[in-house]
Amino acid sequence: MPLFTTLSIIHNAGIIHRGISPENIIVTTDCELKLTGFCISSIRTSNTGLSPEFYSGYTAPEQYSSLEWQGTWTDVYALAAVLYRILTGCMPLDAYTRTKNDTMVEACRVNPRIPQHISRVLSRAMRVRGEERIQTVSELVTALFEQHTTHMEHPKGSTQTIPIQ
């Protein structure tokens, strides 16, 4: 959760990271996660001849166009893509490719042990159109961790253990 908290704090300060990827998440010897590479894209492009750095599979679609707005939803896309990679073991499809032909496979289809609820949240957080995406890290956290009291999803073939009284 510290990574989610860090992103919420920087977003509340008006800062968008624009480069979240496994390469920019460092695990310390104390097993803490550190996010690096802040604002690299804005530094690289402001009054220079440099192009922004894109992270295939993690860069949000709107980052490929100078005409589209970027915001907290841009980082939500990248964070969800990192979670997708962790949970499935597969690289997410490149967003630029997805804008032309979206063939992204849901996480639960890649790894059947992923609950459908989590898979749906990741799909919503990685929608191609920014306005259709989960907008903030706090919304992402709420969606990922909300409890389903009326219907708990269990993987096929699983059984429920009921304590003996």
Each predicted region: which residue ranges?
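Conserved protein kinase catalytic core
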Residues: 43-45, 91
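Activation loop
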Residues: 48-57
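Regulatory extensions appended to serine/threonine kinase catalytic cores
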Residues: 151-165
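Protein kinase catalytic-loop region centered on the HRD/HxD motif
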Residues: 3-15
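Canonical protein kinase catalytic loop motif
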Residues: 16, 21-22, 26
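C-terminal lobe helix-coil module of Hanks-type protein kinase domains
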Residues: 57-149, 153
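Conserved protein kinase catalytic/activation segment
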Residues: 24-37
